A protein has these predicted regions:
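An anion-binding catalytic pocket shared by soluble metabolic enzymes
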Residues: 229
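Glycine- and Gly-Pro-enriched alpha-helical subdomains that act as flexible
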Residues: 115, 119-173
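Feature captures the catalytic cores and cofactor-binding loops of soluble hydro-lyases/lyases
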Residues: 147-224, 232
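Intrinsically disordered, low-complexity regions enriched in acidic/Ser/Thr/Pro/Gln residues
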Residues: 1-129, 134, 138-140
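Short beta-strand-to-turn element immediately C-terminal to the catalytic PLP-Schiff-base lysine
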Residues: 132-133, 224-226
Length: 232
């Protein structure tokens, strides 16, 4: 359910969780089928996207006919960008995510998320995305074989949750442009990645007002964009 809601929000299919009326989870031999009942306006929007939205473990331009189609967010000034962010998460955590975070909280998150990665410990084959509070403690974590899926699960979990504490998103993967885009679509402001960001991810983060941090280690990290949200 977290994935279904989060994917729909981060892909712009739904603007708010209230547009998702029901989810039926059907176990299949080779996976899981999600049957979703959504608002008519959202269904029409989905048909107009002309994109194959088959879920995979890792998908960037899958089904998109062009890079322009894949890059869903326009470059906006601050006032318009604020208004464009997803309503579903803005009510829960957008204001909290705008708080100033410290270097020590980012560094603490590195170890704290590893402790929370249950599937990774069992399989050694999963990524994780987490919501981390101002003290560097992991509040919510979601895992998946694919980093994009893990991010969608986190977005869905946060959309369903009550007001979250101030904090930021942490991912165990590299920061691709898709990860930055999903964070921006969800109305979040800070993405911290354990590995490197791509060049396009940095450019999009700068344009969309997302603070992007990469190469997180126990006592160091690199700030790529909008460093004003981090107190070093």
């Amino acid at each position: 359910e977290d994935f279904a809601l989060g994917f729909s929000l981060s892909e712009g299919i739904l603007r708010d969780k209230s547009e998702l009326y029901d989810i039926e989870i059907v176990q299949q031999l080779d996976g899981i089928e999600l049957r979703m009942d959504v608002a008519t306006e959202s269904f029409v929007k989905l048909k107009e996207k002309r994109r194959n939205l088959v879920g995979r473990t890792g998908c960037g331009l899958c089904g998109a006919e062009s890079l322009a189609q894949a890059l869903r967010l326009p470059v906006l000034d601050d006032s318009k960008q604020e208004a464009s962010k997803n309503d579903a998460l803005r009510a829960n955590i957008h204001a909290a995510s705008r708080a100033l975070i410290t270097a020590s909280s980012i560094e603490s998150a590195f170890a704290n998320m590893q402790v929370k990665q249950v599937l990774q410990k069992a399989t050694g084959a999963t990524h994780a995305c987490a919501w981390v509070n101002m003290d560097g403690m992991v509040e919510v974590v979601r895992e998946d074989v694919g980093r994009h899926n893990a991010m969608d699960k986190l977005v869905g979990a946060l959309a369903k949750a009550p007001q979250q504490q101030a904090g930021f998103v942490l991912t165990s993967s590299r920061a691709s442009y898709e990860m930055v885009q999903k964070v921006a679509m969800a109305g979040l402001d800070i993405l911290v990645a354990i590995s490197a960001p791509t060049g396009l991810a940095v450019r999009l983060a700068e344009a969309y007002g997302v603070t992007l941090v990469g190469f997180l280690r126990e006592h160091q990290f690199v700030i790529y964009t909008h460093a004003n949200r981090i107190k070093v």
